[in-house]
Amino acid sequence: MRVKKKNTTGNARNFVTRSQAVRKLQISLADFRRLCIFKGIYPREPRNKKKANKGSTAPTTFYYYKDIQYLQHEPVLAKFREHKTFAKKLTRALGRGEVSSAKKLEENKSHYKLDHIIKERYPSFADALRDLDDALNMLFLFANLPATDQVSTRVTKDAQELCNQWLALIARERLVRKVFVSIKGVYYQANVRGEEVRWLVPYKFPENIPSDVDFRIMLTFLEFYSTLLHFVLYKLYTDNGLVYPPKLDIKKNKLIGGISAYILESKDAPFLSSVDGSADSENQEVQVLDKKALRHAMKADDKAGSEADEGDADSNEQVTNIELDDFEDKNKNHGDILEQPSQYDSPTSTLFSEFVFYIGREVPVDILEFLIVSCGGSVISEAALDQADAANVDVSKVTHQLVDRPVVKNKVAGRTYIQPQWVFDSINKGELVPANLYLPGESLPPHLSPWGDSVGYDPAAELAEEEAESEEEEEVSDEAEGDEEATLAAEEDEEDEAEAEELRAQKELELEAQGVTYSEAADSAAPSKKASKQKKRKTEEEEEKDLKLIMMSNKQRKLFKKMKYSNQQKEQEIETLKQKKKQIAKTKAKLKKLEN
């Protein structure tokens, strides 16, 4: 019989340590990390670490052997090796003082592309959209970061450009479905080609970058995610008949910026249109000139036509004019007219289509402009009125003014003054919320997450509970009326009990005649009575639960216990929130008393 070698089968064969993988690929550890991030390969946990590490118990990171074999044929790996040789040549040239040769080396430096990796990892467009959440979160994070030694200005500008291109397309196609304003930032959810894409946009506050963050890994992820978003944006823009990348209005970008600065050019249309539907000023002038030229040409044609008619008048005298018969439709009942399907399938897409919003200085324009435009509304910001072209803006069409101040002094007639939360709650509900709850200076209703738990805390449910309690109190009053009838029934029960006592006395006499004491008979009957009472206490549902628990496997039983524990924790959290709400209500009541 042939003796098997140790560590050649099983875990020892299927897994490779990180140091072995780096040695096999002949690259540095930093390049190995980058390659794993690009290809989507991550460390694995073997069942038996000792066997996988060939008898050693030292803490190590493991990878699948097949994954490392897969990396050996990667074109980017060859580019990493080329870059390594380039770095050696460059340091040698700079050490010798050969500046011209160093410049030539820099110009002829090899660059790698991640296009083929994107196509490998995302074979369909739906797969790319499903994995877009993390990409957008990373890009919006870097777009709001300040430029430092670790993060260059080029990186932040590229991230800002990509983010604005994404927002401009989402706003134009009206794809926003949900929004939630939290402490971390603003969460958005859009429906893109049937896929729900959710991302977080941080607030534009100065960021304090922690020192323990490894920006090398984050920048590698950013490089991959930016390539992915380029692919997705190109596909979405071209499918909607738009030119990618969109053109940028430099004047608007300097003054206001945001999505209104991007001009989305259609491939078929002869002019450019911005995200909010307003045409570019230069293109409007071109259109006016074209119309003038058209009028002159039409006048010239009319003159030429009249001269030709005068010359041919003699020949046309003999020609008789033939009038066509008019055919009337005798059927007066035209039937039901079918409504044409709307371009937008969601009610939120046309929620603000009839409104013009005026945004004050104290309100964040970038957040509300994106939401209002994506719901079909128009926006006029107070900051935009400071521009030179402010005279062309018609403020008389404003229907709603967003205010984040306690008191508005000079109110304009015909406008509805509301707080910004009205926009968020209307989008989440899919319909216009009553504006009287969101007036300036009013205490706002709770802004709840649209993705909240069904078991979670719902302040609106508390109102229903209070109503139920009031109904119960009414029932109690009705029960009090029926107490009189109950007293009559109690008197009858007392008579029955007296008869039962007489029967017991007779039984005692019979047992004494047989030679058995009554106390012994009572003791023997007591446990059976207790058991019957306990059985009665247990409901049918509890018995079913017990049976199910008995039939469960050990794994299922543990999972059930975990679920039970998590439900108990949720209930405790709900109770704490209710108590907090009560305390806040008490403090508010005390403050009102002090004010009065």
Swiss-Prot record:
Primary location class: nucleus
Gene Ontology cellular-component terms listed: nucleoplasm; PeBoW complex; preribosome, large subunit precursor
CDD domains: BRCT_pescadillo_like
Compositionally biased tracts (Low complexity): 519-529
Coiled coil ranges: 460-596
Segments of skewed composition (Acidic residues): 463-500
Pfam family, one: BRCT_2
Domain BRCT: 347-440
SUPFAM superfamilies attached to this UniProt entry: BRCT domain
Subcellular location: Nucleus, Nucleolus; Nucleus, Nucleoplasm
A GO MF term: ribonucleoprotein complex binding
Key words of the record: Coiled coil, Nucleus, Ribosome biogenesis, rRNA processing
Stretch list, region Disordered: 449-552
GO biological process: maturation of 5.8S rRNA from tricistronic rRNA transcript (SSU-rRNA, 5.8S rRNA, LSU-rRNA); maturation of LSU-rRNA from tricistronic rRNA transcript (SSU-rRNA, 5.8S rRNA, LSU-rRNA); maturation of SSU-rRNA from tricistronic rRNA transcript (SSU-rRNA, 5.8S rRNA, LSU-rRNA)
Comp. bias regions, Basic and acidic residues: 501-510
Free-text function comment from the UniProt entry: Component of the NOP7 complex, which is required for maturation of the 25S and 5.8S ribosomal RNAs and formation of the 60S ribosome.
Sequence similarity: Belongs to the pescadillo family.
Subunit-structure text: Component of the NOP7 complex, composed of ERB1, NOP7 and YTM1. The complex is held together by ERB1, which interacts with NOP7 via its N-terminal domain and with YTM1 via a high-affinity interaction between the seven-bladed beta-propeller domains of the 2 proteins. The NOP7 complex associates with the 66S pre-ribosome.
Designated name of the protein: Pescadillo homolog
Species whose genome carries this gene: Eremothecium gossypii (strain ATCC 10895 / CBS 109.51 / FGSC 9923 / NRRL Y-1056) (Yeast)
